[in-house]
Amino acid sequence: ISVTNNPEHIAELNEIKARYALELKSREDNTKRKITALRDKIQSNYEIWTHFITLTFKENVVDLKLAKERLKDWTKKMKLIFPEFQYIYVVEFHEKGGTHFHVICSMDPGKMVSNKKFNEVRRTWNWGTNTSGIDIKGINYKYVPKSKDSDKGELALKKADEKIKTIWSVGNYLTSYLKKDANATFLFGSKMYGSSTGLKKSIEITDPKKIANLEREL
């Protein structure tokens, strides 16, 4: 008897296809909710964010549990330098299956981090190479090139709307990894992002000028 002509087999096959389609839709919807929630949390706390950090491993770490343990150890070291240290991280998988972390964080908000503390931060990540492993980019300040009135360039504090745009871009950048590695989340059965406690969950922007500036960036 041909399987393709057997009504029972056809019905069973259609049921399997329907369940699979439903599972894919559920995973897609779940990923969208996670992306929205994470982006909201990043944007809601825009005032405290000062730096964007990427942490990479010297070896190809495929054990996500081990990678997260090392990340946790790193956050403890950061809290020793910055007692009010706050963060949100996202995991990204390399093509070979290894992991690294993208972190938006708060170091001494409202202040410029001293060279001494900056060097201490560089020594907090022990699992990279001697010359790399931790890449740090500032969020609060922008580089102003030298002009007629200045012989050299300098760092200037960003205006509120400039920082909001920066945080918006960083939020989109971070959440893009959740979308890219959605299947990896399903396979490993582990959250691909996390944060410190005490962060705001959502915020509503009502200032027409800020809304207009943000809309122009979309």
Summary of predicted features, one role per range:
Residues 1-99, 108-218:
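Right-hand nucleic-acid polymerase module
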